[in-house]
Amino acid sequence: MKRKYLYIAPLLAFIAAGCEPSIKDEINSGTYYAGEADFSSYVAIGNSLTAGYMDGTLYRSGQQNSFPNILAQQFKVVGGGPFTQPPLDDDTNDVGGMLINGNPLPGFDTKLVMNMSTSSPENKKGTVTLDVNKRAQKAYHNAGVPGAKTFHLLAPGYGSMSNLLAGKANPYFVRTATSDETTVMADVMTLKPTFFTNWIGANDVLAYATSGGEGLDQNEQANGTDLTQYGGNDITHVGVFKMAYEGIVNTLVSGGAKGVVATVPDVTTIPFFTTVPYNPITSAAIVQPGQNEDAVFGQLNLLIGMFKEVLTQLGQGDRLQLLDKTKANPLLIQDKTLDNLEPQLNVILKMLVDSGKFPIKLSDQEIAFIAKGFGQARHATAKDLMLLTSRAQIGGALPSTGKPEMDAMLKKGITYPIDDKFVLNVVEQEKVQAATNAFNSIIKNVANEKGLAVADMNDLLRKAVSGLRVEDGQIYTADYFKGMGNLNTVMFSLDGVHLNPRGYAFIAAEILRVINKHYKANIPLVNPAVYPGPTLVLQN
């Protein structure tokens, strides 16, 4: 199931270079001006997209290419002041990740790299040295906090170590919070901002989407405005979002600062949701050397056909389809929006096994296991979005049953459904879209009321799906790294959610265009082409 890529050796030196831009343009400050803006104290509000998070983590060299840091360098030409970012000097191996008291913090792995020897993205091998306990307790101009939702920026204790141990704080803010009870906004306002960028809001819907809809849409809950009832993967209630967003912006402009607010991207257009096809099951993918193609497909269809026949008796036969050796066949997935037919399947399967009509003898426990899996199973359609994380599931074996013939029979995505959390179905997509539209309406209304500039990242990244041409003539795309073919155009990092250095430069360039137009400024743009793309290594 792995793709094979060809790489060109002479490019390796360029590819393996550090994350600093390799070309510096000479800029004559006399030809540029700040217009109606004052960049003497620029602060950046946001989440991981603001922090410079990429390749699945926040690491030292990656942070240097955060879009706020890129902007700050351009602002210096027109009177911009110092710009500080949370220190990552203790990330001595430049691999990111996170420790707590010297032990790995679950879910905080090292950065992803493309291993050229295996043609696959892998976590970089290396020792994690970044520790939550190294607390700077200082406000920084880049106030992007990976994982933060809108309401988190106003929450006291979001940087408290005791709250972190209770699962109620953020390790990145714990490292910088000036006190246990401070808020992100309280700390950033001590820097007396004169200009800001505010790109917060994506996580208010993204966490739900990247979990395959495992959370709740709080807009559908009776107590949807009660934050104590929220789970990490929930969609934020529109009322909560509005109150938090207005509070953030009101705080930022309270001292006279001007700025740019950015809309929430349609997360379903990013590579995390568009890379894995719904129909990757082909003859080439499942027939091994030496196997007979007809025999393989015949055996698979014997099993699928039996389940289809059972579901037909229950009026749901269209949930499944037989595999065609000449076509790209869809994945078998779980869909929790379907009626659960587990009880009925349990009864019918037991009858088939007892009568000897099932291919192998199964115990009652094994029958229950299969009935549970197929109770809400169906074949995927083109409308389903397979998560990037589903790649590792396809064709994978289930936990051993102790019965070799059963283990060989059930393969994830082929003859046993991939779990619902690896799929964003149509119902879940509609919830994501509704929330995104509502959030962006709020963002634009607040910007209009306060006279702020708007960088429409939703529109920009949606257009990038088909390719966007910029001043250097290059076309940049919102797709996943596919090899040398899109090495110089891909904007997303290997996690499929966050941008790579080139992508963040692309964002910075768009924000500069917005600033120049709205605030009648003339600030030099940046050239994304001189920033690195995916991180490739010969071996890991």
What are these regions (language model features)?
Residues 2-5, 9-41, 278, 521-540:
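Bacterial Sec-dependent N-terminal signal peptides
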Residues 30-38, 177-194, 249-254:
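Short amphipathic alpha-helices and their capping/turn segments at secondary-structure boundaries
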Residues 40-56:
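Catalytic nucleophile-elbow at a beta strand-turn-alpha helix junction centered on a G-D-S/GDSL motif
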Residues 58-243, 268, 273, 387-388, ...:
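Conserved SGNH/GDSL esterase-like catalytic core that processes O-acyl groups on lipids
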Residues 67, 71, 481-538:
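Histidine-centered active-site loop/cap adjacent to the catalytic His
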Residues 95-107, 120, 132, 151-177, ...:
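Surface-exposed intrinsically disordered loops and tails
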Residues 191, 244-261, 435-455:
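A structural motif corresponding to the C-terminal end of an alpha-helix
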Residues 270-451, 455-488, 502:
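Acidic, Ser/Thr/Gly/Pro-rich low-complexity segments that form flexible
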